[in-house]
């Protein structure tokens, strides 16, 4: 069995990255908001730090944010520029998310 850990908790990632058979990591804004409270870090700053811990080859899924398709596309491109390595963009399954996928071909 392969596992993907969905968290924004940097300390947890540091603890489990080498202890468990974690195949990939994932972070979305709703999970990250709780993990980032009080740290002073942004979603992207935290994602960069997690990427440093897990290495560039490990799949890392990050959700693009935005109220409109255009905002989601802009955020997706920003994530790809900032977070190197095997990074994949998650798009919310909603009308604006589907529109973003269609527009950004």
Predicted regions and their residues:
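Active-site beta->alpha loop and helix N-cap motifs at the rims of alpha/beta catalytic domains
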Residues: 4, 9-14, 19-22, 27-105
């Amino acid at each position: 069995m392969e596992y993907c850990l969905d968290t924004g908790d940097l300390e947890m990632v540091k603890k489990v990255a080498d202890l468990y058979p974690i195949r990939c990591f994932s972070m979305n804004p709703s999970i990250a908001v709780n993990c980032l409270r009080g740290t002073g870090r942004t979603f992207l700053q935290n994602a960069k730090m997690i990427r440093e811990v897990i290495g560039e080859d490990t799949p890392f899924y990050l959700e693009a944010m935005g109220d409109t398709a255009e905002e989601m596309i802009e955020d997706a491109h920003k994530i790809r520029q900032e977070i190197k390595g095997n990074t994949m963009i998650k798009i919310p399954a909603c009308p604006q998310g589907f529109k973003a996928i269609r527009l950004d071909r």
